[in-house]
Amino acid sequence: MKLISNILYVIIFTLIIVLTLVVISTRSSGGEPAVFGYTLKSVLSGSMEPEFNTGSLILVKEITDVKELQKGDVITFMQDANTAVTHRIVDITKQGDHLLFKTKGDNNAAADSAPVSDENVRAQYTGFQLPYAGYMLHFASQPIGTAVLLIVPGVMLLVYAFVTISSAIREIERKTKALETDTKDSTMST
């Protein structure tokens, strides 16, 4: 019982730490956790199916040199000031000192209407994805999601602590009763 109790404690405590880090990272990065140049992005549309589905969480790496990008690479770029898009490069052209990337969602019939300037490219898809985990990240970035992801594990830890303390008190009472019974029995026999 003690081993199960300790394992349960470690699992709940680890869950609280992980969820707290996800929430903090999500809040501080504007909704997308980033570590060492890698960012988790939620897939909001089906434009890249079957490569990754709506609701998936994909891992992208910050671009350090756009000249290394090739036709067929999947990139994340800023379509406008507030909209990040992840599509595949279908063509690359040079215009003066800049590269222009023609992109297309795998599930779209036609390429994107405007080419993407190298200045707007932010990251490259690493090939790693977690299906449906993007829904969780989106939930965590909302105020109610933040509250739930911090409060629920906290309540679980409090319930666990209450059960553990209650169990310890019952064990102490049982041992005290047994000791009193042994003391009475030994007093009566003398």
From Swiss-Prot:
Record's bilayer topology term: Multi-pass membrane protein
Membrane spanning residue stretches: 4-24, 143-163
This protein's UniProt keywords: Cell membrane, Hydrolase, Membrane, Protease, Transmembrane, Transmembrane helix
Mutant phenotype after disruption: Mutation impairs colony surface architecture.
Active site (UniProt): S45
CDD domains per UniProt: S26_SPase_I (cd06530)
More details: B.subtilis contains five chromosomal type I signal peptidases: SipS, SipT, SipU, SipV and SipW. They have different, but overlapping, substrate specificities and have different transcription patterns.
Function: Required for the cleavage of the signal sequence of TasA and TapA, which are involved in biofilm formation.
Protein name: Signal peptidase I W
Source organism per UniProt: Bacillus subtilis (strain 168)
